[in-house]
Amino acid sequence: MNKIEALIEQYCPEGIEFKDLREVAKISNGKDHKYLEAGNYPVYGSGGIMRYVNQFIYNVESVLIPRKGSIGNIFYVSEPFWTVDTIFYTKIDRRSITPKFLYYYLKTLDLTELNFAGGVPSLTKTILDRISIPIPPLPVQEEIVNILDKFTTLEAELEAELEARKTQYEFYRNQLLNFEGKDVEWKTLGEIGVFIRGNGLQKKDFTSSGVGCIHYGQVYTLYGIYAYSTKTFVSNDFAKKLKKAKKGDLIIAATSENVEDVCKAVAWLGDNQIAISGDAFIFRHNQNPKFIAYYFKTNSFFENKKRFATGTK
């Protein structure tokens, strides 16, 4: 029996009580902030902190729940704050529930399922008031919060470490693949290979099985430097109409909404040929496919690419 189970057995052997949110917290509206002067108190909207002002709307621990817009963005605040009219704040009955326990529980819910609007996602007090909240005894709540806080800290540390490693990787990749001023032979892509434009494939053509395929949009959303298998397929009959990439080819996105993703490339290392969509190129060459794909990610290639990019999607 773990500590949480032991506490539940000790304090609520008959089970955990549930209450509507309105029974443990009063939901309050935010207000306009435009007339306020600059200061030290954060102003929250549904997207997060917007600015800092010289007044606060509430100065007690609270959970902020968006009313409109990014309704999944729930915030826990422990310092004085101001909220605008797109986000609710809560006055919590601490005799029944700890604010952070309420925050963690609400984060487990998909509030978008409670959206009542057809346009901009929206929530109302009436809808939120009816949310059922588990109310274990306060010692149980505090232990749960303590455990989740530790995992939150660990997650933040791991994210920071991952970001540091990513920066380190990008630095060494650019250094290792920087041949400017060095005694190496330079050739254009056209001198080492040929470009074959894809054709005809749209997302609506995907099937659950068949011939593997890569749509140009997937090159910068689903794939890394190289791939041995595809995420999607087309029927055998439809595949006969499409251009195919074979092992060692690069698949290059020819268009994007930003210059960073234009010419994003994935090296195809699978044994079977795969179908390619329009707005993508197959680059067929006699070089190391991973080397070429890695080079496509360097700062040097990016700067050259910017010179030739004629527009975005």
Language-model features: locations:
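Amphipathic alpha-helical segments
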Residues: 1, 15-17, 129-166, 170, ...
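Accessory (non-catalytic) regions of SAM-dependent nucleic-acid methyltransferases
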Residues: 1-11, 68
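Intrinsic, low-complexity N-terminal interaction/targeting segments
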Residues: 5, 33-35, 71-78, 87, ...
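Non-catalytic DNA-recognition/assembly elements of restriction-modification systems
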Residues: 10-43, 179-199
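Short, structured motif recognition centered on aromatic/hydrophobic residues
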Residues: 16, 41, 103, 148-151, ...
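DNA target-recognition patches
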Residues: 22-71, 202-235, 246
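A short beta-sheet element
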Residues: 45-107, 116-119, 124, 215, ...
